[in-house]
UniProtKB/Swiss-Prot annotation:
Pathways involved: Amino-acid biosynthesis; L-tryptophan biosynthesis; L-tryptophan from chorismate: step 3/5
GO biological process: L-tryptophan biosynthetic process
Isomerase found in the keyword field: yes
Reactions performed catalytically: N-(5-phospho-beta-D-ribosyl)anthranilate = 1-(2-carboxyphenylamino)-1-deoxy-D-ribulose 5-phosphate
PANTHER family attached to this UniProt entry: N-(5'-PHOSPHORIBOSYL)ANTHRANILATE ISOMERASE
EC number per UniProt: 5.3.1.24
SUPFAM superfamilies for the chain: Ribulose-phoshate binding barrel (SSF51366)
Protein name as catalogued: N-(5'-phosphoribosyl)anthranilate isomerase
């Protein structure tokens, strides 16, 4: 299996081009005003037009007002919505658009393999479950979490595709892939020079590290 790669927190056209040229499968726009990577829907709509076919656009929200989500759906037309706050399963599904549900792994109530797996099961309609590290903020913290907490999810035959995030970069993503065998990895701060400013060299190095890990798993 090939590990898919999403580069999140894009704010500049040049960074989208770098991600696409390196082979990223998806790019993410952050619509959470509290983030340093926040983009206005008008800008995201312009940037979205530079994304070629067969590269997914993901819109990230944190506890949004329904009108704000609908505005992004209308203006930007993302392929997927990523919910990164405290949204219920019904709130995630209400828009009729494929969605990812993020879990702040290690947070109270999500701090054992059993508790985490149980929380995930409520979101069985999701296109994927994304696991990020728990911190005071939401996403892009650059912090890793104990991947042993995913044991219950990985053992669940009904689990949705596992998307690994949280403190990933070119130096550690290979080890994480070999340990967790995720469907995809989601990286933001690990390929940045500053919040919202991606490094082409770091993006290329990350994609190379992912491919090398996949080759090792295939015995190549």
């Amino acid at each position: 299996m090939r590990t898919r790669v999403k580069i999140c927190g894009l704010t500049r056209e040049a960074d989208i081009a770098s991600a696409v040229q390196a082979g990223a499968d998806a790019i993410g726009f952050v619509f959470y005003p509290g983030s340093k990577r926040y983009v206005q829907p008008v800008l995201a709509a312009r940037l979205r037009r530079t994304v070629p076919a067969f590269v997914d656009v993901v819109a990230l929200f944190v506890n949004p007002a329904p009108a704000d989500v609908q505005a992004v759906l209308d203006q930007v037309g993302p392929d997927l919505i990523q919910f990164h706050g405290d949204e219920s399963a019904a709130e995630c599904a209400r828009y009729g658009t494929r969605f990812l549900r993020a879990f702040r792994t290690g947070a109270p109530g999500l701090d054992t393999p059993g508790n985490l797996a149980a929380a995930c099961r409520a979101y069985d309609a999701a296109a994927g479950w994304l696991f990020d590290s728990y911190s005071a903020g939401y996403g892009g913290s650059g912090q890793a979490f104990d991947h042993a907490l995913l044991a219950g999810v990985r053992a669940d035959a009904a689990a949705r595709p596992l998307i690994l995030s949280g403190g990933l970069n070119a130096a550690n993503v290979g080890t994480a892939i070999e340990a967790c065998r995720p469907w995809a990895v989601d990286v933001s701060s690990g390929v940045e020079t500053a919040p919202g400013e991606k490094s082409p060299d770091k993006i290329r190095a990350l994609l190379d590290a992912v491919r090398q890990a996949d080759d090792r798993l295939r015995g190549l």
